[in-house]
């Protein structure tokens, strides 16, 4: 249980937050499991992702994540970033590398520049920085259930998440 639980919406939903990093091999391996799990979750589960922001490369990757969300291309580009980093061994560690990546996947430089360094994306990255500290994220992937419970990625992580989701649902 978290020392300082996060406030969650009181809309009858149980929030599940996955904290990840594109460059993490464990996060990449867990991605297909998370996708499959998310397809089977009840309607009262609200699933979200948040990039970890420990250092400058993590913050750049967080800006990529929020840019991808802003242009509405999560379904295609999220997997493409993971693939580029893990299959092509291109860590995308500079803004120039990120720009080249987006160009290769068909995002125009004008669309990219509209979002990557925008106020909205910067604000979301800053919020991720705050939450990374507040939640004391020391490894990824990590899953937070309803702002209260921290689940480290292990083989049984999603079963643990299911248990906690049901427990939280019965408490609401």
Name every feature range the model reports, one short phrase each.
Residues 1-56, 126-129, 133-134, 166-172:
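Extracytoplasmic thiol/disulfide redox context detector
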Residues 23-26, 53-57, 84-88, 121, ...:
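Solvent-exposed loop/turn segments at secondary-structure junctions
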Residues 27, 57-58, 91-94, 125, ...:
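Alpha-helix N-cap/helix-start motif
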């Amino acid at each position: 249980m978290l020392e300082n639980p996060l406030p969650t919406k009181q809309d009858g939903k149980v929030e599940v937050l996955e904290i990840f990093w594109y460059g993490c091999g464990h996060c990449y391996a867990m991605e297909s499991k998370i996708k499959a799990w998310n397809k089977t979750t009840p309607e009262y589960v609200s699933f979200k992702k948040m990039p970890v922001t420990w250092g400058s490369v993590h913050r750049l990757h967080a800006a990529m994540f929020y840019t991808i969300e802003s242009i509405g291309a999560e379904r295609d580009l999220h997997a493409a970033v993971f693939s580029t980093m893990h299959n092509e061994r291109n860590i995308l560690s500079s803004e120039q590398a990120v720009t080249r990546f987006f160009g290769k996947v068909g995002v125009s430089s004008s669309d990219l520049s509209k979002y990557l360094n925008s106020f909205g994306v910067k604000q979301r990255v800053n919020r991720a920085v705050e939450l990374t500290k507040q939640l004391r994220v020391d490894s990824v992937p990590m899953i937070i259930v309803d702002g209260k419970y921290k689940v480290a990625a292990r083989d049984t992580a999603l079963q643990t998440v299911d248990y906690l989701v049901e427990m939280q649902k019965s408490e609401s």
